[in-house]
A protein has these predicted regions:
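C-terminal membrane-exit region of the final transmembrane helix in multipass inner-membrane proteins
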Residues: 9-15, 287-288, 365-409, 428, ...
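Short, membrane-interfacial amphipathic segments enriched in basic
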Residues: 1-13, 411-430
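Interfacial "coupling" helices/loops that link adjacent transmembrane helices in transporter permeases
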Residues: 22, 282-324
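Small-residue-rich transmembrane alpha-helices
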Residues: 48, 285-290, 297, 321-356, ...
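N-terminal membrane-entry
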Residues: 259-276, 367
């Protein structure tokens, strides 16, 4: 008592005493929260990273970042679309011409506006060098086309002789063999097994040779990224008026396919998330339940000697909040080490090795870290609330005498006298059985926790094997 400070508040004294008394439990609880936050943050980030890679993969396979467009669109159709609240942006694309080699087409020539190219087409390409064509004689080719032409080391501004023709067979202006200036080049991933490719020419070349935008393909970027293609098509059909020859083409968005390919369905995703949270709750609850008996006895003793119940609860809340916050910070550091150090290499090796080189992507998402911390703190609060409910339900004397075998409602029936049963040479079986089922509630919670852990391990293995592109 030499170092005792008589000026300390009662709560401070109780907190110090509780911290010293429960050092082992608090240390174990800190480790559990650290691991839980780190694992949940890492799992969420891994799912997010995998989804982003799948979205990029789907965009590259489609050749564009949008999944919905209208064929033979007009200015009137564009005006109708701009009035819909779910439409983010609209672009134009026109398949105007083609490149031939001995009368065989090997490349489509496309004209797009600025919005269509920058926001809806360029994200599907990689290694983009140069700019979109602006002058009449400029062209932008893919590396596949350049290799077909025998050009291994392309340079922006180089002159290339090409046999070009408009898709309108009645328009012969500006067709035939002619020299183009290479304004840029890119790598595409659409139809990799096919020799066909796509090139971009300037809008000025179309205007000079008497072509017009209409009719053209109207590219639609909408907000319903996680709706199916049929749902989007149905929504557009009910809100716009189509003319003769116009039709809506709506595929499943890249985001929708990313979730479907990884989880199978939204239902399974929700089920898996609930299992993770329930397993986490049981994990923390079991840790608190280890010292439940001694904690209640100590709180009962404190109430008997004059400490109010609300003071005990206040001390408990502060103690758990401190452990939760420090454990969350440590878990964030643990998860950050995995996300910055291991996850990019893991994703690149498992998912992007056989398709396209993984571009620089930001996998650390603060919102996922906040979500993981909130879930863990909430789960810790629920587990602590179970302990506080028992404290409120029992009187101080009942808390002092509390054991795991306590029953709150005494039966009026006279207890039956059980006959002694001899187990012969194996009495340990009898003792193990009696200890195992001494508290059926604890036995049930522990069994459920172990079952959930095994199920999560199996589900994780199935998901990882299912999304591995090498399989």
């Amino acid at each position: 008592m030499e170092n005792y400070d008589c000026n300390q508040s009662a709560e401070r004294v109780l907190m110090d005493a509780s911290r010293k008394k429960n050092q082992n439990r608090n240390r174990l609880l800190f480790i559990v929260i650290t691991i839980t936050v780190g694992v949940i943050f890492s799992v969420f980030s891994l799912i997010y990273g995998k989804m982003e890679i799948d979205i990029q993969k789907n965009m590259k396979a489609d050749g564009m970042a949008v999944s919905t467009y209208i064929e033979n669109g007009t200015a009137d159709m564009t005006q109708q679309l701009t009035q819909l609240p779910c439409i983010e942006s609209i672009g134009k694309e026109k398949f105007a011409g083609k490149l031939l080699d001995d009368s065989i087409k090997y490349c489509d020539c496309v004209i797009t506006d600025v919005t269509g190219f920058e926001k809806m087409i360029r994200p599907a390409f990689t290694n983009v060098v140069g700019t979109y064509p602006e002058k009449e004689n400029e062209i932008m080719l893919s590396t596949k086309t350049l290799q077909y032409l025998g050009i291994k080391n392309p340079e922006v501004g180089m002159e290339i002789e090409l046999d070009f023709y408009w898709n309108d067979i009645f328009n012969t202006s500006g067709t035939g063999m002619q020299n183009f200036l290479l304004s840029g080049y890119f790598t595409e991933y659409q139809n990799q097994t096919s020799g066909a490719s796509v090139a971009f020419i300037s809008e000025k070349s179309m205007e000079k040779n008497g072509l017009q935008w209409e009719p053209c393909r109207i590219l639609i970027d909408h907000t319903k990224k996680y709706s199916s293609g049929s749902q989007i098509e149905h929504m557009l059909t009910n809100n716009i008026k189509l003319n003769e020859g116009q039709r809506i083409v709506s595929m499943n968005p890249a985001e929708y396919r990313a979730i479907s390919e990884m989880m199978g369905s939204y239902g399974f995703a929700v089920f898996f998330s609930v299992m993770v949270l329930l397993s986490m709750f049981l994990f923390i609850y079991n840790i608190l339940n280890i010292s439940l008996e001694k904690d209640l006895q100590r709180y009962g003793l404190l109430q008997v000697i004059g400490v109010e119940q609300k003071q005990n609860i206040k001390v408990m809340n502060r103690e758990m909040l401190k452990i939760g916050l420090t454990g969350s910070i440590a878990g964030a550091v643990l998860g950050g080490m995995f996300i910055w150090g291991i996850m990019p290499l893991l994703l690149e090796k498992m998912y992007a090795e056989n398709t396209w080189k993984l571009e620089r992507m930001v996998f650390f998402q603060p919102k996922l870290l906040i979500l993981a911390i909130v879930l863990v703190i909430f789960t810790l609060g629920v587990a602590v609330e179970c302990l506080k409910r028992k404290m409120r339900k029992l009187s101080p004397l009942e808390c002092m005498k509390y054991t795991e075998a306590v029953t709150y409602h005494k039966s009026r029936k006279k207890p039956k006298i059980k006959k002694f049963r001899c187990w012969g040479k194996h009495p340990e079986i009898y003792l193990a059985k009696k200890y195992l089922f001494r508290n059926k509630k604890t036995f049930g919670i522990t069994s459920l926790s172990l079952w959930l852990g095994c199920e999560l391990a199996l589900c994780s293995a199935v998901i990882v094997n299912g999304v591995d592109l090498q399989n």
